[in-house]
């Protein structure tokens, strides 16, 4: 009797571990693709555009243009993305990012806060928000289609 309760608890615990791991892997895969700046955030920041493309293998391509049309940053930066944390009561994942090279606009280390239900990505460090981005599913799908035909 007691053994069956213990076995049932272990099976439930195993299912929970597998579920959380699967959700974290899904979030890491969802992180890949094209992200663009929120219009309200861009206006408040004095920017015309902010694009981030995260390719598989986690190389980040940043393109930032100010309101005068001047390119502030247009570069490819290798990023190390680690520490998948799932917030149980909110569908938010936190990824710790370390960039190999950096510009004065970003710290060398920051966090991606990903809400996959809203398609929103927040770049922040120590509660300072550097960007609010939304997933561009069309550009992401187009990039995957082009890559498929090139290779």
Curated annotation (Swiss-Prot):
Cellular compartment(s): Virion
Signal peptide from the UniProt entry: 1-24
The organism's place on the tree of life at top rank: Viruses
GO CC terms in record: virion component
Primary localization: virion
Keywords from the UniProt entry: Signal, Virion
Protein family per UniProt: Belongs to the asfivirus EP152R family.
Protein name, entry field: Uncharacterized protein EP152R
UniProt source species: African swine fever virus (isolate Tick/Malawi/Lil 20-1/1983)
